[in-house]
Amino acid sequence: MNLNLLKYYIKENHDTVSTLALALDIHYITLTLKLNGKREFNKHEIEIISKRYNFDAALTMKIFF
């Protein structure tokens, strides 16, 4: 998992942990734990993030797997 690359895309898209957490319908602390590698993203969250930032399949794989 390449969390630094995901953090880059969050900033590049002028998003914050709070706004992304709202889009994922999770608490911002839960998202922070996921961004720090303490918890894993589930399939639904990966789909939402990939659509939100227009990731292609290769980039999704690079970031999350």
For the regions a protein language model found, what residue spans apply to each?
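Helix-turn-helix DNA-binding elements, focusing on the entry/boundary residues of the two helices
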Residues: 17, 28, 46
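A short, Lys/Arg-rich alpha-helix, primarily the initiator
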Residues: 1-15
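Recognition helix of helix-turn-helix/homeodomain-like DNA-binding domains
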Residues: 26-41
